[in-house]
């Protein structure tokens, strides 16, 4: 055996025999509560100096990340500590570690983390800390490293986050979650089937996206952990979990998972002793304001593989629209025929989600009722867009009653009322104002065209016609927008102005005729007077 191997064995033996060793580890079966004392090791290389200030890094970890964990844990966890006072230089150049790729081997990561711990060992008293973060001046693919490094303080560092100095907040939260004992929520079955990066939980949990961007290639947004993770860490109390066995009918209400930790937060439906379905309410509040969608998020844990999302819209290749909800464009009913249960979203008040967990058969009836509501609603909307509003008030009334019946889980009654709403919507017609306005606008157009074919001599009439044309144009716009009453009013005003213009033109023509008559009459009188004067003059000369 070589001297080097012998020395290593003696070192390991010595380390294993030290009585005062304190392991920085995590018991997955226990809760993570209280202040998490964290040290940040800043490291650089002979060929790569740092560019970020320690103040910027301190703010990222002990202000921004701390703020996130306080909210996500409902005040049960905070992050405190400090970064090293200097950037410690590692013994090898940066290229020797090859840490920029996600495919970097664990051996290389462990070597880097070990060198970082040793480099900072003289400065840091590791007994004061429970968590270790190592930030490098070079590009490092974020990861959590398992290792076994003994320090001068009698501490074994067995886990640490390694990342670049420029790590994003969302990536930092994810890797710190690994330090707390959480797993990456990557569904490898879906991943291998080609749903990339939708093979994760989409954007519903920081632990589900290890790529740094969402399913559409956009930078990921920081949201709350799913209820499963919060339950594992002890942040959700047992009194906040509603356990419902399949087979019966139960009603419950959930508070939003990101609203502060008050009320019921999780419905748990066991499938077996190790597998179960979970329902949580995700609403745009707190960090969950960054969610792309909201509603009842249903997840499944089979006891072995990572958590899976039950997708209400499996036709899309992403999970951003996976939540169930009672609103247009979403399904409120999940039916599991194998386990024999259903989850029905009865009402979403934004601050409270009303749920019914029942049999699969009841879920099928609820699904029919919801589809009847959707059909009636779409028919009403289509007719309203076309302008067929006469009769829609009755359809709207029946639809409202149907929705009210659904929220009270009266699904048979919902079906009846929704069908009545649909039938009333089918019978909707255009209102009288629609017909009258259309007819009058056509008449107005004809009169304006007629007026345009002849010259008008009255300036007052011309101005009236110009104003009538403005009213006509505005009336056509209102008609196209479905404002029949305004269109009718404008058409009537245009008609009145046209009639007034015709009258003014007639008056002007009569005035012109009268003026011509007076001129002719005056000329005739003058001629007669002149003739008479001439006759008188001739008579005087004869005398």
Give the residues covered by each predicted segment.
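Bacterial N-terminal signal peptides that target proteins for export
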Residues: 1-8
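Bacterial N-terminal signal peptides
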Residues: 9-19
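Sec-dependent signal peptide cleavage junction
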Residues: 17-27, 538
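Non-catalytic C-terminal accessory/binding modules of secreted extracellular proteins
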Residues: 30, 39, 44, 49-52, ...
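Predominantly extracellular/luminal regions of secreted and cell-surface proteins
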Residues: 51-109, 203-239
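Active-site-proximal segments of metallohydrolase catalytic domains
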Residues: 72-156
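Extracellular hydrolytic enzyme modules, especially secreted metalloproteases
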Residues: 126, 131, 136-289
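Long, charged/polar, soluble alpha-helical segments
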Residues: 358-543
